[in-house]
């Protein structure tokens, strides 16, 4: 049986974390969860640790000091997963923006293609709920911009609901991933694409968080915008080559 891991980065997610963990563990299939908490002052980590006795060997946490960024959280999780023999690793938000019910389809698609599966908001029109029109348009056209510059055949290039195969993660030099905010999502997909891995999109409905606070900022957006141009002219090699 494949070993499937869900990585959930957190910062001040006490309103959501227990519910999202219980929802994932209620699904058919054996999913494990790794929470990576960046020193949440609201007690998020304590909630996770209180649940670990209830879900032994399925729930783990890495606690970091301070807000170190989304990208570094996932990179830490990827390395942790590879060391422990996981076959497929899926990124997921803690706030239910990504529906846990889509996890089986995400893992199945990744296993079938052997590369990367993307929970896509834009492969079947625009499937976003509770976002202001301005943010929807910014996100949609940002993905079109990335797709045009990088010539990558992915409709939702900035998606954060992404599943990677072990083969893809082992081929990517994780120590050479340079973008740390949401640009990290673009860089990881593009690196896998340039290394020859298939990327498939799974249609999802993205629902804006109902509880907690968004972590998006203009600085994060700017890093992604300019980082795409730099990516276009980088050369990529499989790790060790």
Where does each model-flagged region fall?
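Cell-envelope/extracellular polymer assembly enzymes that use nucleotide-activated donors
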Residues: 3-5, 32, 187
């Amino acid at each position: 049986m494949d070993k499937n891991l869900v990585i959930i980065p957190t910062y001040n997610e006490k309103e959501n974390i227990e519910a999202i963990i219980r929802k994932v563990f209620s699904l058919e299939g054996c999913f494990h969860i790794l929470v990576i908490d960046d020193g949440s002052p609201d007690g998020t980590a304590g909630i996770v640790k209180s649940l670990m006795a209830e879900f032994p060997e399925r729930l783990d946490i890495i606690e970091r000091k301070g807000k170190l960024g989304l990208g570094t959280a996932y990179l830490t999780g990827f390395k942790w997963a590879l060391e422990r023999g996981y076959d497929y690793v899926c990124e997921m938000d803690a706030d239910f923006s990504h529906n846990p019910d889509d996890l089986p389809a995400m893992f199945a698609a990744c296993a079938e293609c052997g590369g990367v599966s993307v929970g896509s908001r834009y492969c079947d029109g625009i499937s976003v709920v509770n976002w202001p029109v301005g943010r929807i348009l910014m996100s949609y056209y940002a993905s079109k911009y990335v797709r045009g510059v990088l010539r990558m055949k992915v409709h939702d290039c900035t998606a954060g609901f992404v599943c990677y195969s072990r083969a893809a993660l082992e081929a990517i030099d994780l120590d050479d991933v340079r973008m740390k905010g949401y640009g990290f999502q673009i860089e990881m997909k593009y690196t896998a694409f340039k290394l020859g891995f298939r990327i498939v999109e799974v249609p999802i409905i993205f629902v804006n968080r109902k509880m907690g606070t968004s972590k998006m900022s203009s600085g994060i957006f700017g890093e992604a915008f300019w980082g795409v141009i730099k990516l276009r002219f980088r050369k990529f090699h499989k790790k060790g080559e």
